[in-house]
């Protein structure tokens, strides 16, 4: 309840602006994600494992800049929102692979790491393009260290 009270004014502000532009209110997932990030800001943690919702590029979790992005097998899901081909869906989901922000850290001296599971070849091509654009190190399936 305390976290909700902390972020409620911001949720109301976003909702009012979105509605004034003809858009929707924040979704339950977006509000819960904001609440989680508020908790992490108030009580810093070393590591957060956050699962994206439907996609990666426009997902509520995309405001975080992860040192590691893990992409599980991509299938033909959420087609109404993400696209009607494996390439379009992969393009949306590839949005979690982002360039390193700021300095590399001792825990992550090489910048962003993209761990990509076994994929349809067309999806893999899209994910690898994004990894190159983000200058991410790609850890293929089965790699260690």
Where are these regions (language model features)?
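A short, structure-level motif marking secondary-structure boundaries and short turns
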Residues: 21-22, 111-113
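Internal gly/pro-rich beta-alpha loop/helix module
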Residues: 67-68, 81-96, 100-105, 112-145
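ATP-dependent carboxylate-amine ligase catalytic core
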Residues: 1-64, 76-83, 88, 121-122
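Intrinsically disordered, low-complexity peptide-like regions
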Residues: 57, 105-106
């Amino acid at each position: 309840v305390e976290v909700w009270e902390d972020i409620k004014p911001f949720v109301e502000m976003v909702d009012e602006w979105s509605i004034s532009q003809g858009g929707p209110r924040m979704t339950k997932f977006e509000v819960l994600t904001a609440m989680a990030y508020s908790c992490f800001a108030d009580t810093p943690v070393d590591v957060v494992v956050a699962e994206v919702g439907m996609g990666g590029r426009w997902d509520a979790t995309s405001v975080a800049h992860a040192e590691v992005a893990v992409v599980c097998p991509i299938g033909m899901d959420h087609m109404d929102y993400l696209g009607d081909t494996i390439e379009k869906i992969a393009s949306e989901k590839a949005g979690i692979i982002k360039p390193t922000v700021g300095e590399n850290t001792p825990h992550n001296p090489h910048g962003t790491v993209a761990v990509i599971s076994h994929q349809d070849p067309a999806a893999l091509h899209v994910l690898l393009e994004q990894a190159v654009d983000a200058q991410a190190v790609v850890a293929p399936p089965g790699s260690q260290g």
